[in-house]
Amino acid sequence: MASHVDLLTELQLLEKVPTLERLRAAQKRRAQQLKKWAQYEQDLLHRKRKHERKRSTGGRRKKVSFEASVALLEASLRNDAEEVRYFLKNKVSPDLCNEDGLTALHQCCIDNFEEIVKLLLSHGANVNAKDNELWTPLHAAATCGHINLVKILVQYGADLLAVNSDGNMPYDLCEDEPTLDVIETCMAYQGITQEKINEMRAAPEQKMISDIHCMIAAGQDLDWIDGQGATLLHIAGANGYLRAAELLLDHGVRVDVKDWDGWEPLHAAAFWGQMPMAELLVSHGASLSARTSMDEMPIDLCEEEEFKVLLLELKHKHDVIMKSQLRHKSSLSRRTSSAGSRGKVVRRASLSDRTNLYRKEYEGEAILWQQRSAAEDQRTSTYNGDIRETRTDQENKDPNPRLEKPVLLSEFSTKISRGELDGPVENGLRAPVSTYQYALANGDIWKMHEMPDYSMAYGNPGVADVPPPWSGFKEQSPQTLLELKRQRAAAKLLSHPFLSTHLGSSVARSGESSSEGKAPLIGGRTSPYSSNGTSVYYTVTSGDPPLLKFKAPMEEMEEKVHGCCRIS
């Protein structure tokens, strides 16, 4: 401490310097005062203790005594090297610890008391002592960035690969770059590789797995509980031992066992932040709504927001699955109970399902048309000449057109109305019955001559004047897939009954108009008839919607008018 004269002299000098310099000088002087005061208090304490010792030797008994571990830790916490040396000389173990497993060496490595650290190590303190969370003194020194203590601990044989309860080694916890360089240099000098590091990390879990296999071989109960009510699955869940937990779950270990505090394995995994373990337990039926004795759910025990979000997502998925299962059961029972009712249960596919269904149909349809168009072009060129030759021979031989196989007109009309005479199906539509030959689905050719114009004979004078529905279609460009979709959708929506008079209008043509209409019918992609027999007339513009044209029904023909036989 400076004398009074020195302080006055310094004060006169400080009046001439800037304010910043005076502030620095004041801070320096204050630090010296505090240091002197601390030294004074420590000296005073020592004098008191000496005086007490002298009095105790006089025959007076102690009234308060402390355990050696408490006294040693208290002296280390105060950085009292002399008292620590006194305890060590009196045969007090340097490895004594408190209820948390913390030794004097741990405490000195945290507070950076280098002198006491050397003193404890020189008296045989365990350099790799572990507390309740498996932290060694090297973990503490590396975490705090005390490079001088790290060097001392390594010189005394500290384990560089020691793993704590979180699975971290000293170099995992070190954030100070110079200290980390020292640790990594020592690891490289000892020949530590990444394979060895991984092996050391997995060693605790591997030991637990081997113990579980021994219990299985001995036929012991895997739901065994310890003194706190914890099972092996609790331990695996708290430490994040996934392989050990999977082994236990595969052998039927219960996931809902509670310890004395009401904790299930999922609570332990949530409290210690074991996210993969929580997912594994939930997938095996662990309840996210289970509560402890303190009415806490697993999500209430989480400290990390990321883990809370994960548990909320798992809970939401679990609720959705349960609701879907209940809905499925209720729908099955409802269908069973209302089997006789009509239209009470309406099932609609979702918009996405319908869109995917239409897309698949259109893709398949496009592929089908690419294959079929090439085959039909080749087929058309092959038998197109046969058609003309057949028609010419028939016109020369028989002025009255007829079917190659005699069929009554009434039966023919009946078959058409019932849909028994169908042409090849193209684009999901039925090909019309025409007066020419067609290629059937099995590859055969169905031949048919022109039919006489019965429409005039049975009182439909306006039918013959109707222009052919495909008269303007021949000159159009090939239809696109979009047009095919629109035509097909329109044809499916129409649900009108088949009009038999369309047959007469389609077959009552002259030889010239018939030859012009053959090409669109044989080589065209779509038919003017829908799958339910409805005739659809298309305008010249391909983009216009199809129009339905109705005609008066043909009167029922009598069988006596046309016989099945004729005189040639």
Curated annotation (Swiss-Prot):
Residues 373-403, 505-527 are annotated as: Disordered. Residues 505-517 have a biased composition (Low complexity). Residues 15-55 form a coiled coil. It comes from the Eukaryota. InterPro entries: Ankyrin_rpt, Ankyrin_rpt-contain_sf, Pase-1_reg_su_16AB, PP1_Regulatory_Subunit. Keywords: ANK repeat, Cell membrane, Cell projection, Coiled coil, Lipoprotein, Membrane, Methylation, Nucleus, Palmitate, Phosphoprotein, Prenylation, Repeat. Disulfide bonds: none annotated. Its main location: membrane. The keyword Lipoprotein applies. Phosphorylated by PKA and, after PKA priming, by GSK3B. Phosphorylation by GSK3B reduces its association with PP1C and enhances PP1C activity. Dephosphorylation by its associated PP1C results in enhanced association with PP1C, but reduced PP1C activity. ANK repeats lie at residues 100-129, 133-162, 228-257, 261-290, 531-560. GO terms for molecular function: protein phosphatase regulator activity. One of its GO terms (cellular component) is plasma membrane. It is found in: Cell membrane; Nucleus; Cell projection. Induction: Inhibited by TGF-beta1. Down-regulated by LPS. A lipid is attached at C564 (S-palmitoyl cysteine). Residues 566-568 form a propeptide. The modification Phosphoserine is found at S69, S333, S337, S350, S477. A lipid is attached at C565 (S-farnesyl cysteine). Gene3D superfamilies: Ankyrin repeat-containing domain. The modification Cysteine methyl ester is found at C565. GO terms for biological process: establishment of endothelial barrier; positive regulation of blood vessel endothelial cell proliferation involved in sprouting angiogenesis; regulation of filopodium assembly; regulation of phosphatidylinositol 3-kinase/protein kinase B signal transduction. The keyword Protein transport does not apply. Interacts with PPP1CA, PPP1CB and MSN. Interacts (via its fourth ankyrin repeat) with the mature dimeric form of RPSA/LAMR1. Interacts with EEF1A1. Interacts with PTEN. Interacts with ECE1. This is Protein phosphatase 1 regulatory inhibitor subunit 16B. It comes from Mus musculus (Mouse). The lineage of its organism: Eukaryota, Metazoa, Chordata, Craniata, Vertebrata. The gene is Ppp1r16b.
